[in-house]
Amino acid sequence: MRIVFAGTPEFAAEHLKALLDSPYEIVAVYTQPDRPAGRGQKLMPSAVKALAVAHDIPVYQPQTLRNPEAQAELAALKPDLMVVVAYGLILPQVVLDIPRLGCINSHASLLPRWRGAAPIQRAVEAGDAESGVTVMRMEAGLDTGPMLLKVVTPISAEDTGGTLHDRLAAMGPGAVVQAIAGLADGSLQGEVQDDTLATYAHKLNKDEARIDWNRPAVELERLIRAFNPWPVCHSTLDGESVKVLAANLSTGKGTPGEILSASKDGLVVACGDGALSLTRLQLPGGKALAFSDLFNSRREKFAGGKVLGQ
C-alpha cells in the first residue's frame, strides 16, 4: 500500500515512526514549511520533516493545498491512502478524493467530543474523566468524519496537558496502523459521529493563561494543569510576572488573589471560591522551582496579605 503521510509536530512524528516500522510503503511526507525558532530565529524543520529526511523520504512543504499545482503534485504520487496527523493545513475535498482509499486522521480526543485544535488541553481543563485517540475518515468538515477506531485512557487528577499529550502520542500510532490494516482488508467501515454530542476545542490563547483569581479554585487548578507545559498559567506579584506550573486545592477565604499563607508546602492564595496552594513557580529570569525552594530563599516576597494579579 502506497501511503502519503501529512503531519508537523512531535505528536505526528511518533505516528510516522510507527508507519516506517510497518509493512506499508511511505512514498512521501507533507509537512508545514520550515519556521523561525529559538533566539536566533533560524529556520527550523518540523519534527516530521527531520524524521523523513533521516529516512530518505521525499518531503513536500506547500503553503497551501488549494492550488491546482499542489494538487497535481500529490496526485502524481498515486497514493492508496493519506494519513494526516496534526498537519496544520486544510485539505479541500479535491485533495481528500485523490487517494484510492481516501484520507484518515488521528485525532487526540474521543470524538465527537473536542473536535478542533486543542483537544488535549481542553479535556484536562474541563475535568474530563477520560480521553483517547480517534482514527477517522476525513471529510471537508472539522473532525467530522466517520470513526474507524478509538483507544481510551483515563485522565488522572495529576495529569497535565503535557503528560496526557505524551500518553496519547504513544497510543495513537498503534491505532493508526491497526486502522490501516482494517481498511486494507475491508473489516473497518466507520461509525458516523453524532453531531449533537460535539464540543469544540478552540485553539489555545496566551491571554487565557492569565489567572483570574475570581474564578473557583477547582477550575483554576485544572487550568494550571491543562496549560502545562504551554502556554503556562501566570499572574503578577509586586509588578513582576509569576508563572504557575502546579497547584493543589486548599482551604481558606480572602480577597481573590490574596496570599493567605506561605510555607514549604506551598503558597496558599484565595480564589473566588476556595483557595489554591501553589507548589511550583517560575520567577522572572529564573527556572521553575518547587515552592519549598523559593520559600527558603525569597520568603519576604511571599508575605501574607499581598495580592497576586494586581
Curated annotation (Swiss-Prot):
Keyword Zinc-finger: no
CDD domains cross-referenced by the UniProt entry: FMT_core_Met-tRNA-FMT_N, Met_tRNA_FMT_C
InterPro entries assigned: Fmt, Formyl_trans_C, Formyl_trans_C_sf, Formyl_transf_N, Formyl_transf_N_sf, Formyl_transferase-like_C_sf, GART_AS, Met-tRNA-FMT_C
Name by which UniProt lists this protein: Methionyl-tRNA formyltransferase
Presence of keyword Protein biosynthesis: yes
Pfam family, one: Formyl_trans_N
Gene3D superfamilies: Formyl transferase, C-terminal domain, Formyl transferase, N-terminal domain
GO MF terms held by the record: methionyl-tRNA formyltransferase activity
Family label: Belongs to the Fmt family.
The organism of origin for this protein: Pseudomonas entomophila (strain L48)
Entry binding sites for (6S)-5,6,7,8-tetrahydrofolate: 109-112
GO cellular component: a single term: cytosol
E.C. no: 2.1.2.9
Alphabetized UniProt keyword annotations: Protein biosynthesis, Transferase
Function description: Attaches a formyl group to the free amino group of methionyl-tRNA(fMet). The formyl group appears to play a dual role in the initiator identity of N-formylmethionyl-tRNA by promoting its recognition by IF2 and preventing the misappropriation of this tRNA by the elongation apparatus.
Domain of life per record: Bacteria
Protein encoded by which gene: fmt
Reactions performed catalytically: L-methionyl-tRNA(fMet) + (6R)-10-formyltetrahydrofolate = N-formyl-L-methionyl-tRNA(fMet) + (6S)-5,6,7,8-tetrahydrofolate + H(+)
